[in-house]
Amino acid sequence: MVRKGRRKEFGKFTKKIAAVGLALAMTVSTAIPTYAYYGFSGEFTRSERLTQTRVTSIFSENELGVVNFETTWGDKKANIASMDEYIEEADKKGVKVLVFPEMCVTGYVSSSDPTSTEYKWAVESAETKDGETASHFAKIADEDDMWIIYGATETIEKDGKIDKNHAYNSAFVCSPDGDVTTYQKITPVEGSWCTSGDTPVIVDAGEYGKLGISICYDTYSTPELERYYSAMGCNILINPTATGGGWSQSNMSAWEEYYKVRLESIASRDGFLILSSDLVGMNETPSNPSKFPGGSIIMNAVFNGPSYLAGADDDSNIITNQEGLLTNSKSVRASTGSTCSNEDFNPELYVDLYSELADKMEENGGVLRYSANTTASTKGPKAAVVNMTGYWGNKTKTIAKMKEYIEEAGKKGVDILVFPETVLTGYGYLQPSQDPFYQKFGVSMQVYTAETIPGTTTNELSKYAKKYNMYIIFGMTEKDEAGTIKDNGVEKVYNSAAILYPDGRIDSYQKIHRAGQENKWSVTGKTPKIIETKWGKIGVDICRDGHFYPELGRYYAAMGCTMFIHPTATTGNAWYRSTRIGSYVDRDGMAAITCNLLGGDGIYVADGAYTYSPDDIDENGDFVGGSAIPETIYNQNEIEDDPYWNSKNWLGTGGVFNSTSFIATKGSTASTALKPRINYNGTGAYSEGFEERGNTSPLGLEIADMDLTGTGFGGTESTFKPALYAKLYDKLATLYRGGYVSKIKDKDNSGTTPETTIPETTTAKDSATKTTEPKNTENKKVATTTVTVNKTLVKKATKVKASAKTKIYVKKVVGAAKYQVQVSATKNFKKVLATKTSTKATFTIKNSKLKNKKVLYVRVKVAKKVNNKLVYSKWSASKKVVINKK
C-alpha cells in the first residue's frame, strides 16, 4: 500500500502575471493547490453564493437574422451598398437583431507581411466607432429600430495617438437608438496586422436580452469568454465569423464537424441562443484568394440535441454555399443558462488555476505547446472502458464483477482500464424515508459504504493493477482519512475516482462539480489531478466536471495533458456525450477515455413490490433486498420488454443508464484530408450494433488502441490568455461570492496597488425583458432602489402623415438619466410594436414599425443613477393615442 504525498498546507505566495493586451501589469496573491486535498474534517464551509442576473426574451418568427454575405474584397463602398440591401430586406421581414459576418465591410484579411497589399488594406481601411461607416449603419439602425452588428477593422485612439501600423478586428454594434459599441477580437488569428482586444462586451438590448459579443476564434476556442458572458446573465451569443475559408471544398464535412461541435457544445452547456453569421463565396485577396462556405445559423440546444432555427436542414446538417438573409423559422425563447449560476460554479478556484497557467506561460516565453510521447512502435496505450453498473449498496457483488472485467482486460493487454462513476456502490440517491441504510445507520447509502483511499477495496484491487501492469480508475465514495465531514450538520463524503497505478501506488481525485442530488450526500473536491505516464500526462475528472465545466479540462490541456479520463454517470444521449467531451479532443488536443454507467441502478423492484427494509443489509454491510437482479444481463433491446431496462423498476435517482462510453482520439486536422476530426475508434455511437441496442454502448469491455498522434495543446499570447481569464473569473467571484476578496490587483505607474480594475462591460441599452420587470439581482443582500414615476408622463403623439414618423414627447423628470418608451397595439402590451431608449424625452419611431395602426398605447419608465448603476422605475400607466393620418 503506497500513497502519494500526505496532506500539505498550501502556502501563500505572490505570483506575477504578464498582462496580455492590458495596459496595466497585474500581481496575484493566492494559494495555488498543488496536491490532492486530504486531512480535511469537521464542518464543510465555502463562500456564500449570491444571486446572479438571468434574463428571458421571446422572439417571434423572423425577428432574428443572420446573413451569408459575399464580400467584394477591398471595396468598402460596394460591400456597404450590399449590406444596405440586406438591411432593407430584413426590415421588411420585421427583423429586430441582424448580424453580418466578420470583416464583411472590407473582406477578410490574414497577413503578417507589412509590405503586402492585404496587410496595408486591413490597416488603412480601419475606422473609429464614430467613423463614416459606423455612422451610416447607426442611422439606419435608428430609423429601422433594429440592432445591426457587423464586422470591420477598427482603429482606436490611445493616449492621443493612433497606431498606423496595426488595427483591430472588431464587431460594430449599432443600437436602435443610433448608438455604436465596438468589441475587439480577443484571440485574433489574422496575422500581425491585428492587435488583440482585452475586453468582453455585453450589450444590454432591452427587451431582447443581454448580448455577449464574440468573433470567430473567440467563440470556437475560448470557452472562458462564453462562461463569463453566461455568468453575467447573457442569453444570446453574437458570432460574426469568417470560418471555413482555409478548408478544402472537398472536405466540407470536416469543417461542418468543427463548426457544429464547437457551437452546439456552447449552446447546450451555457444556454445561449447563438446567432452566427459567416462569409460565403470568394474572398478575392491579391495573393491568397479563398472560398468561404457560408453556413450562417440561428441555433440553441438543450440536453438532448440542437435546435436549428435557420441555416440547417431537418437533420441539423449545415446548409453551405448559399448567399442570403436567413431568419428564425419559428418563435424562440432565449434564456440565460443555469450552469454558471450553479452553486458549484467555482470562479474562486478558476482564478487560481488560470493564474498558475499565466505564470507557466510567462516562464515559457508566452507559449504553451505540447505533444504526446509517441514512437514508431507505440502510438499510445491500449485503453478499455467497462460498460456496467454496480449492485446498489452491495460492494461484495460489485467487486467480484469488477474483478472479472479486470481479468479479461489484463489478458487482452489493456494498459488503462476505466470503470464508471460510483460503480463500486451504485449511483442512485434515495430519500431518508426510502433508504434502508439511513433507516438503519442514520446516513445515506453513499456515506455508509464510503472508504478512505487507500482503503480495503483499493488495496485489494491494487494487486490486480500490479499483476497486469495496468492503470485502473473507478468511481467510489470516499471518506476523509482525518475524520467525519459535516455539511449543515449532515454527514457527507466525496464522490471520487480511485486511481490504481501499475507500480502499486494508490491515489484519488475528488469531484469538484456535483450533479443532481449529489449535494445530499457529497461535498466538493478542490484539486485537479494529473497522472504522469510513459505516454504523457493524463488529467482526471468526473461526469459534470467535464460535461458542464470546461475550466478544469482547459487547465489540464494547458498544463500538458494529452489525455483525460472521465468516469461518468449520465443519462445524456450520444449527441450530448460526443459534443461535450468531443470538444476537448477537437479544441484542446486531449484524447478522451470516458466511461458511463450502463444498465439499471438503484433498488430493483421488477415484481412491483417494494419489499425491502433495513433488515436487508447483511452482516458485511451489503444490501441484499429488492427483486433479484438477473445473473445474466442482456443488452438493451436484445430481449423484448426486458424488465431490467425499464426505469420504472428501479428506485433511486439513477434508474436506467442507457447512453454511451467511448475512447476518442484526434482525427485528421489537415484541411484537405477526408477524415473526421474526432476518431471514436469504433466505440460508443460508432460501435457495432449501436442503433439495434437503442443507441447505447454494448455491455462489458470496449477496447481501443489509442493513437495519440496530433494530440497536445497549443497556445500563444495571441490565442490563449490565462491572465485575462483569471481577471474575468476574479470579477465574477467578486460579484457573486459573498466574502470573496479579489486576488488580482492592478499596479499603476507609481507602483502602488489601488482597488482592482476589471475590464469594463459596455452597455449600449438599459435592461428590460419581455416577460419580467428588471430587478437589481446582483446581490441579494442589497435592497432594490425604487424610482417613482409620474403616471401622467406620456403626452399626446403629434399628428403625422401616413408615410412619416411618429414623435412621442415625454414629460421630463428631474434627475432622470434615461427614458424608455414602449408602443403597443394592445392595452395589455402583449403586442409590443416598438421599444426605444433615449437620454432625451423625445422619441421618433418609423410608422412602418407601428404597423399603420390608428389606435396605439404608449407607456414610459425612467432610470436614475443609484451608486453608479441605472435603476429603472416601473412602467407608467398606459396612454391611448389616436393617430390622425393626413
Q: Which role does the model predict for each range below?
A:
Residues 28-43:
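Sec-dependent signal peptide cleavage junction
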Residues 76, 85-176, 244-265, 269-272, ...:
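Cys-nucleophile CN-hydrolase/nitrilase-fold catalytic domain and related Cys-dependent amidase chemistry
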Residues 126, 139, 155-265, 320-327, ...:
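Active-site catalytic loop in hydrolytic enzyme cores
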Residues 126-147, 220-319, 323-326, 451-471, ...:
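CN hydrolase (nitrilase-like) catalytic-core segments centered on the catalytic cysteine
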Residues 746-787:
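Ser/Thr/Gly/Pro-rich low-complexity, disordered linker/stalk segments of secreted
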Residues 804-815:
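Conserved aromatic anchor
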Residues 850-868:
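Beta-strand-rich modules
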Residues 867-885:
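Extracellular fibronectin type III
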